[in-house]
Amino acid sequence: MREYELMVILNPEVEERAVEPTLKKFLEVVTKENGTVDKLDIWGRRRLAYEIQKKSEGIYAVVNFTAEPQTAKELDRVLSLNEAVMRTKIIRPEEQKIHGK
């Protein structure tokens, strides 16, 4: 199992109260494969540096989770198929890379 950090930008048209349930639905991919969701941090509505899909704002969220590499790939695939998700980025935190060497 490896630690990952996911940053996701959701369409600003998603209701604020629907953000957490929407993310938890996506994160079921991780929990079904015996992974764990360590932290879910919703930053809220922020201005984008440049327009994405003709939108100048997005709802940012950061999720720390532990899973197998193929589970992280599947999560990225599931997120990319959803229209409410504007951008995603999954990385392994720097600290983990240093300790892994």
Curated annotation (Swiss-Prot):
InterPro entries in alphabetical order: Ribosomal_bS6 (IPR000529), Ribosomal_bS6_sf (IPR035980), Ribosomal_S6_plastid/chlpt (IPR020814), Transl_elong_EF1B/ribsomal_bS6 (IPR014717)
Gene Ontology terms, MF aspect: small ribosomal subunit rRNA binding; structural constituent of ribosome
GO annotation, cellular component aspect: cytoplasm; ribonucleoprotein complex; ribosome
UniProt xrefs under Gene3D superfamilies: 3.30.70.60
Function in brief: Binds together with bS18 to 16S ribosomal RNA.
Family in the record: Belongs to the bacterial ribosomal protein bS6 family.
Protein name: Small ribosomal subunit protein bS6
Taxonomic classification: Bacteria, Bacillati, Actinomycetota, Actinomycetes, Micrococcales
Gene: rpsF
